[in-house]
UniProtKB/Swiss-Prot annotation:
Family, as annotated: Belongs to the ABC transporter superfamily. Carbohydrate importer 2 (CUT2) (TC 3.A.1.2) family.
Coiled-coil blocks: none
Residue ranges of every copy of the ABC transporter domain listed in the record: 7-244, 254-498
This protein's UniProt keywords: ATP-binding, Cell membrane, Membrane, Nucleotide-binding, Repeat, Sugar transport, Translocase, Transport
Catalysed transformations (reactions): D-ribose(out) + ATP + H2O = D-ribose(in) + ADP + phosphate + H(+); D-galactose(out) + ATP + H2O = D-galactose(in) + ADP + phosphate + H(+)
Origin: domain of life: Bacteria
Task of the protein: Part of an ABC transporter complex involved in carbohydrate import. Could be involved in ribose, galactose and/or methyl galactoside import. Responsible for energy coupling to the transport system.
Predominant location category: membrane
Identification of the protein by name: Putative ribose/galactose/methyl galactoside import ATP-binding protein
EC number from the UniProt entry: 7.5.2.11, 7.5.2.7
Subcellular location(s) per record: Cell membrane
């Protein structure tokens, strides 16, 4: 092995019942570099990383760390050898302090008594934070931290294990641009110390900003590795999906119909104030804004998740009284939530069971479920949406993020709503699955659905929307037509600057 490499994974193969998750995959990471691992959801990235940190055992292949073959049997074994992973779904102990989370199970303690030396624990945490330029109180409760700060704590925890190799899974998926810059500063600092990072992302613009090399997997196979600065966007997409995607957004011309939903003066103290908008049949309205701008909160209030303090909602021209999500569903609404794992999926249930949670009463006759009808309808939608699963009885937690998201969309298609709210519909989803979901959204609009899309991805807002509503600190700052909407104009409004538009 070349001395340049801190890690080599060679000919890694892993099979599960009915599916070969990895087939002869390789990954080589140079010391002191950031190595991007990319591929569609279901390409094998997660399985490969789970093998590296000891969750799975490969059926074939070998792992070489610092020139020595390594057989990783447990997560603790991986940590002891200097390999740690920061997961996309953070799971801190919320009622413990920052310092206690970092050194959990390794707390400095008094001999015999077993009491934790709290002052020493806090001191070690402060020293770690100073090294990483992290400004967080070691005594703060984890439950009180933002997602970005939780992430910083996880990085500090990884460094506290003297990790030589850190895996970061979608580290920028839920943090602001300012927080991303801070994260990148820390990553560059770690590189200078000789730490290597495997960086899993779907955001192509991050490749040149922070990574040195890119490895692409597709359908459980190794496709190739190239220096990041030599990889064009088109080439990367071609490697990831196995086909060219010259245009992801093929927006068909759709006749815009009558107003399906009108919201007037919606207000919730501390969240949003005097928000008014409407969406018509066949129209896609994008909600843009920075994190914390109130976009999600407005949709949740319209959908009955929370109760507004003031405002009126009209559905098809008639005033609607919505006190619960059940009321919203009766009015023909559907909501794809922002966090599919936290508020969307029932992870212990099957794909089929997740698809029918909203419509289960429609399939009940004389107190019995119409299993054949359920199976037929779910199978039809699974084929229509290209949901990749060995069976509809497969537990949904085993599906890739993109396929989980499609199953949630299928849930609402079974309900057949007139008005559909899509909150971050492609978060954590690869480019191929995104294209499929965009096509589906356009088809829904073509069929007369009124659609509102909340997205933090600018190309998504610009590519999908007939109109763009921009929020800033709980207020509607402006509304742009498709022709008026540009990245610069949206960012101006999103940061609180007023601009002149036709409206």
């Amino acid at each position: 092995m070349s001395e340049d490499y801190v890690l080599e994974m060679i000919d890694i193969t892993k099979e599960f019942p009915g599916v070969k998750a990895l087939d002869g995959v390789q990954l080589k990471v140079k010391r002191g570099t950031v190595h991007a691992l990319m591929g569609e959801n279901g390409a094998g990235k997660s399985t490969l990383m789970k093998i590296l940190i000891g969750i799975y055992t490969p059926d074939r292949g070998k792992i070489i760390l610092d020139g020595e073959e390594l057989k990783v049997s447990t997560i603790k074994h991986a940590l002891d050898r200097g390999i740690s992973m920061i997961h996309q779904e953070l799971s801190p102990v919320p009622n413990m302090t920052v310092a206690e989370n970092i050194f959990l199970g390794r707390e400095p303690s008094y001999p015999f008594a077993g009491w934790v030396k709290m002052k020493e624990l806090v001191k070690k945490t402060r020293q770690l934070f100073e090294r990483l330029e992290i400004d967080i109180d070691p005594n703060a409760k984890m439950a009180d931290l933002s997602i970005a700060n939780m992430q910083m704590v996880e990085i500090a925890k990884a460094i506290s294990y003297h990790s030589k190799l850190i895996i970061m899974d979608e580290p920028t998926s839920a943090i602001t641009e300012k927080e991303v810059h801070h994260l990148f500063r820390i990553i560059r600092s770690l590189k200078k110390e000789g730490v290597s990072i495997i960086y899993i992302t779907h955001k192509m613009d991050e490749l040149e900003q922070i990574t040195d090399e890119v490895t692409v997997l597709r359908d459980g196979k190794y496709i190739g590795t190239k220096p990041s600065h030599q990889m064009t966007r088109d080439e990367l997409i071609q490697m990831m999906v196995g086909r060219e995607l010259n245009q992801i957004f093929h927006k068909p011309k759709v006749p815009i119909g009558e107003v399906a939903l009108s919201v007037q003066g919606l207000t919730k103290k501390g969240k949003f104030h005097d928000v008014s908008f409407e969406v018509r049949k066949g129209e896609i309205v994008g909600f843009a804004g920075l994190m914390g701008s109130g976009r999600t909160e407005v949709l949740e209030s319209v959908f009955g998740v929370t109760k507004p303090d003031a405002g009126d909602i009209y559905v098809h021209g008639k005033k609607a009284t919505i006190r619960s999500t059940r009321d919203a569903i009766r009015y023909g609404m559907g909501l794809l939530t922002e966090d599919r794992k936290l508020t969307g999926l029932f992870l212990p249930l099957s794909v089929e069971d997740n698809m029918i949670t909203v419509t289960v009463n429609q399939y009940t006759k004389a107190g019995f479920l119409q299993q054949r009808k359920i199976r037929e309808d779910c199978q039809r939608l699974a084929e229509q949406l290209s949901i990749k699963t060995p069976s509809l009885q497969q537990l949904i937690k085993y599906l890739s993020g993109g396929n989980q998201q499609k199953a949630l969309i299928a849930r609402w298609l079974l309900h057949n709503p007139d008005i559909l709210f899509l909150d971050e519909p492609t978060r954590g989803i690869d480019v191929g699955a995104k294209a499929e979901i965009y096509h589906l959204i356009f088809e829904l609009a073509k069929n007369g659905k009124a659609i509102i899309v909340v997205s933090s991805e600018m190309p998504e807002i610009l590519g999908l929307s007939d109109r763009v509503i921009v929020m800033h600190e709980g207020r509607k700052m402006g509304e742009l037509t498709r022709e008026e909407a540009t990245q610069e104009r949206i960012m101006q409004l999103a940061t609180g600057q007023l601009i002149e538009t036709k409206r």
